[in-house]
């Protein structure tokens, strides 16, 4: 009967869930053992050395240059029109682009015919990580953080790093923070006629936002970090354990940049059972078109992994993951600009310079960034005059695409931004 079938199915799913949970715990424990971590690090280093000797690395570099041009000129412009919130490219610096999402035309500081001032939309700059693409915040109309914030009356801009080629491998964090982001924020301030802009950083993008806010506090209205690692010594997620053990210079010597395929392999390896059974478990039950579209869109985003610029990856791993300099106020960003000879040794990123209001959003079930690492930021920003913390029952990506997040979290976050603007 149908009731018996439903009961059997329920028993099966519960058993399957239990087995997968136990298997994950076993693999997670084994993958953290010092012997395995060393083996993984040595294997990647040896593979990279072999690729360098045999010419595979050089072949990858040549192919990567072609792929970068194809992606930047054709794939990405087409991709940004599929199910996305309408947007315009308003600023471009080399491969970096600044986008502005369409909203009802309201000019800042204008007045209506009856003399009442039009309420201006506070400008917000979304800063994404170097891993994958920023469109996870605008994946589909039903689960779009961008649309959610636009509906609340915010003026949303987004930073897009583009697809780097191998000849970009020497770009540094300074290029991204003190040049690309700084010029973008100056542009936003000019076109919106405001003095300060709210920064909205997700994952590593939150770390870039922290760096910028510490170096240029006079241009930042509010600082919002989402699932952002703060105290890297507290980040005991599996990927962080592996990252600290990696001999990244071997990879960069062979491939120039950090290949996206290696990043994807690491993401899949940390949960091998779930990875191997993912599609079977999803399609074993009938699904409606909406859930299928959301699943496939998420999978597309997961594997849309551009390379990470070599020097930026080296700096981020060395300064943050291995030495934990950011939260210690000891991270130095080298000044690579041609017109600034007074800062030969660069500038120290001092989080005590962050005095503006700060909102920290944490995913309680985050297995990519330890919640304790993110939470430490509220203690580290000692001079912020207004600090808020939202802990949401979700995973890392669930913050962006979870239905409950769009009903509960983002209205609250949007309200916080408006109240502090």
Short names for language-model regions:
Residues 1-55, 190, 194, 200, ...:
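Alpha/beta-hydrolase-fold enzymes
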Residues 31-113:
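Low-complexity, highly charged intrinsically disordered N-terminal segments
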Residues 85-165:
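Short, surface-exposed "cap/lid" segments of acyl-processing enzymes
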Residues 170-191:
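Alpha/beta-hydrolase active-site loop
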Residues 317, 374, 379-397:
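Catalytic histidine neighborhood in serine/cysteine hydrolases
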Residues 354, 360-362, 366:
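Short beta-strand/loop motif that positions the catalytic acidic residue
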Residues 367-373:
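Conserved alpha/beta-hydrolase "acid-adjacent" motif
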Residues 368, 393-408:
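Catalytic histidine-centered segment of alpha/beta-hydrolase-like enzymes
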